[in-house]
């Protein structure tokens, strides 16, 4: 009989977190953008507590993960839960593990009095888009994400 659990990442699992980040990046065709290191993730997740990770396990084998943190909505007047990464191994998709991870985070968001949960999805990722819509998530078509990379941050911060 298969057992399925969702649990928080342990302090000695930064390497596993990085492994799953790299698997997600490969799936998203963005592997060349991964700069994270095991040491940096350990510091961010388990020392400074800047984000959290939960793993989905099937019979004690990790089959998926979610990395998330809190943001804040001035419109709602409360914090939110921001899902940075969600990934389930390709051979384990369609078994409900992604939905279980999202449901776990939704319950956590409610327990923590969050006003909403948000994430982004690549516009070509139709399987994920369809999945998110199936659980009632709504795309924010009127919004555009802007980003300053570290280099651009430096140029802007030090510029005139």
Protein language model regions, located:
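Active-site acidic-Proline motif in GNAT/NAT acetyltransferases
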Residues: 89-91, 95, 123-124
């Amino acid at each position: 009989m298969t057992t399925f659990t969702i649990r928080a990442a342990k302090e000695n699992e930064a390497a596993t977190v990085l492994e799953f980040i790299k698997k997600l990046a490969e799936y998203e065709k963005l592997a060349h953008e991964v700069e994270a290191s095991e040491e940096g993730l350990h510091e961010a997740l388990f020392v400074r507590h800047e984000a959290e990770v939960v793993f989905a396990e099937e019979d004690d084998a990790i089959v998926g993960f979610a990395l998330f943190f809190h943001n804040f909505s001035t419109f709602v007047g409360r914090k939110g839960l921001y899902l940075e990464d969600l990934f389930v191994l390709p051979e384990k998709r369609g078994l409900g593990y992604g939905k279980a991870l999202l449901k776990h985070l939704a319950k956590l968001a409610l327990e923590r009095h969050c006003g909403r949960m948000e994430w982004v999805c690549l516009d070509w990722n139709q399987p994920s888009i369809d999945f998110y819509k199936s659980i009632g998530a709504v795309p924010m078509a009127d919004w555009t994400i802007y980003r300053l990379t570290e280099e651009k941050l430096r140029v802007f911060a030090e510029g005139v």
